[in-house]
Structures are given as C-alpha cells and as structure tokens.
C-alpha cells in the first residue's frame, strides 16, 4: 500500500512529508487548523456525497476564501488555480455552490457543532464569577457588508448594504450567525424584527435544557414584552441600556455590597416598572471612574445573587462583538457581500464565523505550547496600569471585574496572516510554529517586504526559505500571497 503524504516546499527544495495525526509536530498546519471542523463533519445531518466538490473541500474553500488577501472571489480562485489547481473548482461551480441551501444548512450545523466543541476545550472567560454559572452569555448586534457587485438597484438606482445579526459567546469568544436581514420586504431591518423571526432553538444557541441564556444587546434590541415572553417560556434573558425617552417607575431597591471592589462605581441597583408594558425590570446605575460618564443598564435578570458590578461589566463586554466586527472587516477584509442571493450572503456569514472560531481554537492551541504575542500582552498590561494610576489620582479604585478580565478580544494581524500563508505552504506544524515565533519576536517585517500591503504574510512565506534559495514555485506563492497575482 503506498504511503500517504504531501509534497512540501522547504529551504532544501521539495520534500515529501508523510501524513501524521493532527496532534503530531510533523502534521501540517492546515491539518491542525481544519481538523476541529472536519472531524465534526461526518456527524452532520446535511452532509452529502459530492464527487466534484466534496463537503470537506467546500468547507476548506470557504474558510480559506475568508482568510485569503484577495478581495474578490475570482481573484481567490485565480490564486488557487495557480497554487493548487487540483483543488480549484470552476468559477461557475463555486458561485453556484454559494446558492445551495443544503450546503448553507451544512455550514450552519457545522458551526453550531464547532461552538459546542469549543466550550469543551477553550478557557471560560467568566469562570471567576460563580453567580453566572447557570448562564450561557452572548453579546448580539447587527453588522453590515457592502452590497454585492450584481445586487439589483432599487427604483432610485441605489444598492443597499447587507445586514446580518451575529452573536458572540462571551465565555469562549466563538461567533455565531443568527440571520441575514429580510431581503424581500425590507433592505434595512430593525434588530428586534430580525430576532423575532428566529426559532427558540436558534436563540438558545445549543444551550442544554434547564440552562439559562442571556443576551447583551444595545438599545436596538429592546422590546420588553417580547423578552418577557422569551424569559418565561424559554429561559432567554436580556441586558441593555436605558433609552432617554423611557418612562420607568422605581419600585424598590436591591441590596448590594458597596464595599466590595466588584461593585466599584455602582450608584444604585433598583427594581423598576416599564410603564405601559407592565414588566418588572432591574436598573443598574454605574459611573465610570475614568471618564465620569453615567450609564444606566436595564435587564430582566432580577436575581440579586448576580451583583450589579457584574451586570455593568457584562455590558462592557458587549464591546467584544464590536471588536469581532472590526476584525472581520479590517483584518479578514470581509467588507463586501460575495454574491446576490440571500443564501449566498448567509453562506458568507457562516464561513466568517467558522474562520473566526477556527482562529480562536488554533490560537488557544499554540498558546498551550507557550507561543504568545508578548507585545500585545505588554500593551494590555500598560493600559491597565495607566487606568489604575488615573483612578488612584482621583482617590478611586477600578472595578475588580476590570482588573480580573484581561483577555484578548481580537486575533492579531500577525496570527491571521501567518495562518493564511501557511495554508498555502502546507509546512509541518513545528516548522510553522517557528515562523510564528519569529514573527512575534519583532515589530516589523524585513526591509525587503516593508512596502508590501500584506507584510506579515510575506514574512511568513520568507521565513521558511534560506536567503539564497529561490524557485519559480516560491515566486508564485510570494506574488499571489502579496499581490494577488501569479508569476508570468
């Protein structure tokens, strides 16, 4: 029986590497990166046998499309055809597959399974708060992409951006797609209208029976009666901020420990009535000691066992999903819809979520091997130290939650470009990690790549070769990864 392996470009030329288990140092980075998703694929109900473009290849293509520097689908396929022609489908086949409802259902099912897998292996950012042990907690919000090239214009000749609703798990940092905006009757859909279209299973995000779910949403997610119904019938809670025009009636105070540093900045913890809606709510008033700004938070989580300082911090963590959107737009470059159909737009969103979640898993994996972006750690520590000094100068203290919760909210550009480059190169895991260590050890790339748009991606490629080693294959990889073109 022939040995299975892969031909890999190395400093010594092309070498044959035998396929190894995903956890082996000789296994390629693509195998380690994709294995959490591909290992779950056989258990998906929507998987089918497709000889021309298998489901596993489709998942890899979609994720690699998100990570690739090319801004267009055709540019991505041209690069793929240059580097791996056997893996590249026809343009028409790729774009037709984006319209497949079955493949969309598969991607949604796969991402849901991947999020469940992540809960078992990733650290819990909220583990320090036992009062939240019975809750799955998500930050939710809307995010827009620019219209697709072939989207139809309205009667005034305008093309509309594409809106999506996403949820980020605040415990594990995983990203889920809830829905794409109504593409038929409304081009700009209100958040609550989009949420009301979702099933209870979608909103519960795979939470087990008996477990509560809390959504942290900005003011566009307020509908007291709807959240009351979801809370009573399905254990789904909300946390938001008060609107200026709300007529709330104070019904009483909830006791809390003012001397506890976790409640620093809390002015009051109250029960309030929502007037016409007739729903009892909890209002937490908090003053930020660094800015002096007063915030009023509103939730239907009435249990005083959850301190008001934790309520205030959970809303502060809502910013994590905004950081995810910034990563998607500015680091992954996903600014524009891939195609015109609602199915294709939802497919793109699912691939974005898969990409972010696989990055979350691979970053955790390399962190367990001691590979950490120390520059980012030092910057975060410096920001905390500056905040503590500012608070001390005002004879105040920072909330304990802010000091306790010092985790990364985005993946670094270096990590993303490293993964993107290594997916093309297919080098062994240990060699790929050595490249990342070298990238993390310096602030800037080599002078020869200083003016490249994707400088860190160029570095990732350069670091596997010796200074005197060149080849047409390496030239092709450098040109396509950096400029999106193949060598002549």
Model regions: which residues?
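A short, flexible helix-boundary coil/loop motif
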Residues: 2-52, 129, 255-290, 330, ...
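Short, positively charged, Gly/Tyr-enriched micro-motifs
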Residues: 52-105
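Short, conserved catalytic/metal-binding motifs centered on acidic residues
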Residues: 61, 76-77, 89-95, 135-145, ...
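Active-site-proximal, Lys/Arg-enriched surface segment
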Residues: 95-171
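An internal, acidic/charged active-site-proximal segment
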Residues: 179-293, 435
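Extended, non-catalytic structural segments that build the interaction scaffolds
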Residues: 296-318
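Short amphipathic alpha-helical "interface-anchor" segments enriched in bulky aromatics
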Residues: 311-339
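Basic, amphipathic alpha-helical segments enriched in Lys/Arg and hydrophobic/aromatic residues
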Residues: 338-364
């Amino acid at each position: 029986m022939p040995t299975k392996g892969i031909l890999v470009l190395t400093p010594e030329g092309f070498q044959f590497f035998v396929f190894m288990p995903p956890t082996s140092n000789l296994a390629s980075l693509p195998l380690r990166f994709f294995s959490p998703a591909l290992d779950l694929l056989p258990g998906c109900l929507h998987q089918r046998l497709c000889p021309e473009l298998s489901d596993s290849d489709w998942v890899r293509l979609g994720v690699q499309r998100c990570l690739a520097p090319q801004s267009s689908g055709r540019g991505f396929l041209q690069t793929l055809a240059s580097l791996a022609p056997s893996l590249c489908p026809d343009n028409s086949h790729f774009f037709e597959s984006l319209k497949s409802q079955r493949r969309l259902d598969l991607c949604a099912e796969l991402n849901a399974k991947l999020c469940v897998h992540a809960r078992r292996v990733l650290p819990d950012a909220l583990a320090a708060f036992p009062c939240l042990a019975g809750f799955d907690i998500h930050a939710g919000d809307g995010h827009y992409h620019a219209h697709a090239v072939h989207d139809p214009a309205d009667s005034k000749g305008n093309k509309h951006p594409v809106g999506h609703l996403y949820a980020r798990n605040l415990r594990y940092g995983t990203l889920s797609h809830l829905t794409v905006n109504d593409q038929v009757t409304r081009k700009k859909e209100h958040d609550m209208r989009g949420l009301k279209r979702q099933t209870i299973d979608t909103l519960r995000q795979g939470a087990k029976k008996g477990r509560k779910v809390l959504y942290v949403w900005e003011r566009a997610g307020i509908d007291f009666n709807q959240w009351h119904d979801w809370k009573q019938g399905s254990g789904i809670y909300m946390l938001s901020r008060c609107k200026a025009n709300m007529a709330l009636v104070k019904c009483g105070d909830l006791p809390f420990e003012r001397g506890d540093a976790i409640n620093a900045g809390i002015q009051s913890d109250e029960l309030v009535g929502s007037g016409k809606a007739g729903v009892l709510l909890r209002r937490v008033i908090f003053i930020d000691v660094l800015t002096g700004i007063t915030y009023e938070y509103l939730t239907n989580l009435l249990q005083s066992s959850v301190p008001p300082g934790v309520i205030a911090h959970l809303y502060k963590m809502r910013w994590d999903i905004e950081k995810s959107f910034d990563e998607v737009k500015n680091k992954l470059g996903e600014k524009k819809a891939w195609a015109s159909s609602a199915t294709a737009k939802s497919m793109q969103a699912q691939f974005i979520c898969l990409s972010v979640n696989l990055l979350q898993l691979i970053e955790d994996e390399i962190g367990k091997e001691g590979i950490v972006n120390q520059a980012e750690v030092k910057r975060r520590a410096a920001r905390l130290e500056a905040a503590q000094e500012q608070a001390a100068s005002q004879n105040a203290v920072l909330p304990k939650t802010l000091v306790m919760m010092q985790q990364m909210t985005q993946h670094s550009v270096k990590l993303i470009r490293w993964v993107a480059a290594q997916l093309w190169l297919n080098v062994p895991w240990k060699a790929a990690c050595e490249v990342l260590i070298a990238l993390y050890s310096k602030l800037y790339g080599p002078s020869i790549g200083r003016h490249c748009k994707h400088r860190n991606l160029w570095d990732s490629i350069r670091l596997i070769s010796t200074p005197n080693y060149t080849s047409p294959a390496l030239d092709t990889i450098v040109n396509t990864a950096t400029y999106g073109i193949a060598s002549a």
